[in-house]
Amino acid sequence: MKLSEISDNPGARKKRMRIGRGIGSGKGKTGGRGGKGQTARSGVRIKGFEGGQMPLHRRLPKRGFNNIFRLEFSEINLDRLQDAIDAKTIDASAVINAESLVAAGVLRRSRDGVRLLGRGELKSKLTIEVHGATKSAIEAVEKAGGSVKILAPKEDKGEAA
């Protein structure tokens, strides 16, 4: 057996059917779409339509609401902070806040503030000013000899009433 003699098994590669190419092709005229009407046209499916049966999105009750005053915080974990300190993108001796994290490229944007989360280990002594922090994050920073200052969230996005 030579490399040039290797071939596929018979029927392993099936030629694709070209539709709408004459009656003799076996997929001509209607092209496998049946008769006329809505389903024969392109872009056929009506989303959520169940043939007249009450659709699922109308059978289920409405729930909840969108709070327009909801605050969205950018989250940062301790391990990410430690990596930035090790890479020398953040100065551990300076006060770390939302602006310094964005300037260093650790966060893309600070949204309504920054929330510190406790995943990972912190070796450096830090002074951090954030808008929120978990108990485990505060404990880890204080254990490393640092301090966490919780700031008030940024000003309300909505108009004054």
UniProtKB/Swiss-Prot annotation:
Residues 21-37 have a biased composition (Gly residues). The keyword Ribosomal protein applies. PROSITE patterns: RIBOSOMAL_L15. One of its GO terms (biological process) is translation. Residues 1-43 are annotated as: Disordered. It comes from the Bacteria. It holds the Pfam family Ribosomal_L27A. Keywords: Ribonucleoprotein, Ribosomal protein, RNA-binding, rRNA-binding. The keyword Zinc-finger does not apply. Disulfide bonds: none annotated. One of its GO terms (molecular function) is structural constituent of ribosome. Part of the 50S ribosomal subunit. PANTHER family: 50S RIBOSOMAL PROTEIN L15 (PTHR12934), LARGE RIBOSOMAL SUBUNIT PROTEIN UL15M (PTHR12934:SF11). Belongs to the universal ribosomal protein uL15 family. This is Large ribosomal subunit protein uL15. The gene is rplO.
